[in-house]
Amino acid sequence: MTVEEYFRFEESSPIKHEYVAGEVYAMSGGTVRHDRIATNVLVRLSLVARPGPCDVFSSNMRVEVARDRYYYPDVTVVCTPVAESDIVARNPCVVVEVTSPSTARIDRGEKLDAYRQIATLRAYLIVDHRRRRVERHWRDVAGE
């Protein structure tokens, strides 16, 4: 499937899908606990982001990791202008994934490697859904 076909497919789909190099992966529904954690993170980051230039988005905002890779993180922070009609965040500075039993390995492996390729990304946070633990992956000012 091409990227263009993926975007057309997503327009009419009742569920969200992530796109990785031509493959489409359905996003399963989360638990109440997962959603509660993601909402708490979103609210806290929104309070910190205001009144500055940053926008904080829920898992409904797709992130372009590369031209052939699109994910729906649980929370995304973008500090560059975003048009109201945008359906993709291209310059995130913070991405948050809340793990689930089916995604923990991917969040810590494939997605960690992919998110590291985003030049604007300063932090990738992985929130463990089972216990009070946040893994922080930072990039310093020099981009390291």
Residue ranges of model-derived segments:
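Gly/Pro/Ser/Thr-rich low-complexity, intrinsically disordered segments predominantly at protein N-termini
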Residues: 1-144
